[in-house]
């Protein structure tokens, strides 16, 4: 059974602003991570509650993993903007 994915409004807008082929690549990579756990994921330091980032080429998806049953996507940004 897969995880429930919750997108905040800002993350939805950021994904819509990205060109379609890149946005689809991001969605496929996110789906693969949610199904298999595969992907370049790291916990971000000094952030509470714990937040993670999934690296997909030049883009970063920031999210909270809620005890394994749901994931809240908080941002989808180009790497030059992701850590500001």
Positions of predicted regions on the chain:
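A short, surface-exposed loop/turn module that caps and links secondary-structure elements
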Residues: 29-54
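Enriched for short, Lys/Arg-rich terminal
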Residues: 1-6, 10-13, 17, 21-24, ...
């Amino acid at each position: 059974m897969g995880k429930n994915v919750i997108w905040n409004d800002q993350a939805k807008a950021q994904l819509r602003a990205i060109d379609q082929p890149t946005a689809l690549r991001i969605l496929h990579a996110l789906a693969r991570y949610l199904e298999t756990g595969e992907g370049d994921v790291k916990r971000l330091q000094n952030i509470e509650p714990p937040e993670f980032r999934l690296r997909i080429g030049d883009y970063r998806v920031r999210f909270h993993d809620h005890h394994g049953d749901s994931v809240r996507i908080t941002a989808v940004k180009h790497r030059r903007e992701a850590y500001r």
